[in-house]
């Protein structure tokens, strides 16, 4: 028998501060799910943040239907090392996204060897931020 284990939003946010790998699920035009591996972080007010190319399917999907689900995992993948978050996403384009892209880079990967090079790459790749307001989390089920 499966055992329901509630996950509080604050606990999920703590998880996202430490673990930056995940799979983002968005909805295609026909309603089917589209999933993408992503690097995820947490902004200063507790929203999930993800970098993406502006031309990516996930961005187009979220502009049409902002519902998003993200399964964040640890590097070990199995066991207790995951959490699901759900919420409405918004797309933040450049230049407004640049500070958040820098913040995410520092959080997930540390200092960049050349910030001018990083900013140039973000412009060249037309990077945006997907920001998800965490409305619910989990559930976690064991068994």
Language-model region placement:
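Short, basic/aromatic recognition patches
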Residues: 2-23
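Short, low-complexity Ser/Thr-rich regulatory SLiMs
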Residues: 42, 74, 91-93
């Amino acid at each position: 028998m499966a055992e329901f284990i509630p996950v509080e939003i604050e606990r999920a946010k703590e998880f996202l501060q430490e673990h930056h790998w995940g799979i983002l699920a968005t909805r295609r035009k026909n309603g089917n799910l589209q999933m993408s591996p992503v690097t995820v972080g947490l902004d200063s007010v507790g929203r999930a943040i993800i970098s993406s190319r502006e031309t990516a399917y996930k961005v187009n999907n979220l502009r049409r239907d902002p519902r998003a689900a993200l399964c964040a995992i640890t590097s070990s993948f199995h066991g207790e090392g995951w959490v699901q978050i759900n919420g409405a996403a918004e797309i933040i384009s450049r230049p407004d996204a640049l500070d958040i892209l820098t913040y995410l880079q520092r959080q997930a990967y540390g200092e960049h060897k050349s910030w001018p090079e990083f900013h140039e790459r973000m412009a060249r790749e037309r990077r945006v931020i997907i920001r998800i307001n965490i409305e619910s989390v989990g559930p976690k089920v064991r068994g």
